[in-house]
Amino acid sequence: LGVPHSYLWFSTTPPALMYEELRKAYDTTADRIWLANCGDLKGAEAQVSFFLDMAYDIDQFNENNVHTYPARWLAKIFGEQYYDTLKDITCSHINLAFSRKPEYMGWGYWNNYWGGGEKRTDTEFSFINYNEAGRRLAEYRRIGKKAEEMLATVDKKAKPALYQLLYYPVKGAELMNRMNMTGQLYRQYVRQKRAAADDLKREATTCHDSLEIITDGYNSLLDGKWKYMMSLRQNYDGSSS
């Protein structure tokens, strides 16, 4: 959880991984007392609930249903009519983060951190080989749009909860990926002396500014009820907020 990169921004631990480890613990007689070091509860509500539900009755879960837990948990809050949408968004969000957490998109040489600053490098997602980066960004844009659409449709009283439980983590992850991988493509275009590099620079800057805006939005919800709970600083340079 420390240098060179923490992962305290979003809770993206896959339910399947949690189930695998806790099922193993339960089956090897660690079935009386479980302790969880979950850090800040804010942002990890679904995972903490999953942990407690498994502690109460682990046999209700199996490898075929654990991946739907986040969607089922959210559907209980916002309505079963949203279950299919929530399942689509949450499963994709967790799968994308499993290949690379949003907090780790800066890449860089970790050992340079000790010199006071980490040198940013390109990601290992390629815009050329199988268009890995392009497909990743397209999927993030898709689920980010679905989260926006759901935020626009839920009841006004439910909007603050949906903003912090679904919209902010999904949109934040989208923008973080877009910012870093657009920056990567920008550097490639600069090396190739392509005029379109300026457009990519503007897009990356817009993503950065949008991250600031939605984070301020989170911290100002309900007259600042969750103020200071979210910070971008740890995700850029590896330090904690």
Report the location of each language-model feature.
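Substrate-binding groove of N-acetylhexosamine-processing glycoside hydrolases
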Residues: 1-241
